[in-house]
């Protein structure tokens, strides 16, 4: 059994059982991957993949367990390399972050600017996607950190640390009837067409929950994953915008009126997560603390030692998180 064989079977699964696509991604040949997979199956005496002719059709029950363990083994191999790098070049390496557009556009720029200035030899890579894509990227080892708010149930296999609370604002054009009000009730908001986030992005679930709580149904006429797109369509008069407060900039958006909506919606919590098996380099600890100052190295280590995210939630229950 070779590490290369384990990497091949994991990557085949990552590429939806498409061996040709896997070969392209690994810069190797399709016959070479197929041969190594067969050799591993012969050595183990079981099929990892079910086949129809030359095509892989699904992962067998035994194969699912083998793939899970192979991921753990490869994660440990990466950890060994990280340990070596920490002792050889503590300020040199790479950092892969998976996050949403809102975090990348509004919450992270200052953090990343300071981080790059401090660690010029650390290459920083950002992957933007949906919460599901973010979870997959970190779970599969394609990203080191997940930074997200929505769909946190997808992250049960990760250590998730709370970073900050945030809430929403209503945005309208100056000639809109709501522009003259300093506060808006959810009943008043329900009377207008809404422009907001796509379900599963940037606290959208809390918007739906708030309307359900009031026994109302929101009239959502347009959704997008990007707050800048939402603001564009508010300017076009399509409806009333509901977006993260951090996405409203008085200097960049002088033609929009912002109304605080914290009385209507409960706050949401953004978290940073990583695989439990990840060896955190010194610069990774520093990135976490730059993003969330209360997450010192000692606090992170204490949280990692806990057995579940429920215990981590309890650990932070009495800690006041920053508000954005």
Curated annotation (Swiss-Prot):
It is found in: Cytoplasm. The keyword Plastid does not apply. Residues 1-59 form the HTH lysR-type domain. One of its GO terms (molecular function) is transcription cis-regulatory region binding. Keywords: Activator, Amino-acid biosynthesis, Cysteine biosynthesis, Cytoplasm, DNA-binding, Transcription, Transcription regulation. Pfam families: HTH_1, LysR_substrate. InterPro entries: LysR_subst-bd (IPR005119), Tscrpt_reg_HTH_LysR (IPR000847), WH-like_DNA-bd_sf (IPR036388), WH_DNA-bd_sf (IPR036390). GO terms for cellular component: cytoplasm. Belongs to the LysR transcriptional regulatory family. This protein is a positive regulator of gene expression for the cysteine regulon, a system of 10 or more loci involved in the biosynthesis of L-cysteine from inorganic sulfate. The inducer for CysB is N-acetylserine. CysB inhibits its own transcription. Homotetramer. This is HTH-type transcriptional regulator CysB. It comes from Salmonella typhimurium (strain LT2 / SGSC1412 / ATCC 700720). The lineage of its organism: Bacteria, Pseudomonadati, Pseudomonadota, Gammaproteobacteria, Enterobacterales. The gene is cysB.
């Amino acid at each position: 059994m070779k590490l290369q064989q384990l990497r091949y079977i994991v990557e085949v699964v990552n590429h939806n059982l498409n061996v040709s696509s896997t070969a392209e991604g690994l810069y190797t040949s399709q016959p070479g991957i197929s041969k190594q997979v067969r050799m591993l199956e012969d050595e183990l005496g079981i099929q990892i993949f079910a086949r129809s002719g030359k095509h892989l059709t699904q992962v067998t029950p035994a194969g699912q367990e083998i793939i899970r363990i192979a991921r753990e083994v490869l994660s440990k191999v990466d950890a060994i390399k990280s340990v070596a790098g920490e002792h050889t070049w503590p300020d040199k390496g790479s950092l892969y972050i998976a996050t949403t557009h809102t975090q990348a556009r509004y919450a992270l720029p200052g953090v990343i600017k300071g981080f790059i200035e401090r660690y010029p030899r650390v290459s920083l890579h950002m992957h933007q996607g949906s919460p599901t894509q973010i979870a997959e990227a970190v779970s599969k080892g394609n990203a080191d950190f997940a930074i997200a708010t929505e769909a946190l149930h997808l992250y049960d296999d990760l250590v998730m640390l709370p970073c900050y609370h945030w809430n929403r604002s209503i945005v309208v054009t100056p000639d809109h009837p709501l522009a003259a009000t300093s506060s808006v009730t959810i009943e008043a908001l329900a009377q207008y067409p809404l422009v907001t986030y796509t379900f599963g992005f940037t606290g959208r679930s809390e918007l739906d929950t708030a309307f359900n709580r009031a026994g109302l149904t929101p009239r959502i006429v347009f959704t997008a994953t990007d707050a800048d797109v939402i603001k564009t369509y508010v300017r076009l008069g399509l409806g009333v915008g509901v977006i993260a407060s951090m996405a409203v900039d008085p200097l960049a958006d002088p033609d929009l009126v912002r109304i605080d909506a914290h009385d209507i919606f409960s706050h949401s919590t953004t978290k940073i997560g990583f695989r439990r098996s990840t060896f955190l380099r010194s610069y990774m600890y520093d990135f976490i603390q730059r993003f969330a100052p209360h997450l010192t190295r000692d606090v992170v280590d204490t949280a990692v030692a806990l057995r579940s995210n429920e215990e981590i939630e309890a650990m932070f229950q009495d800690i006041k998180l920053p508000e954005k």
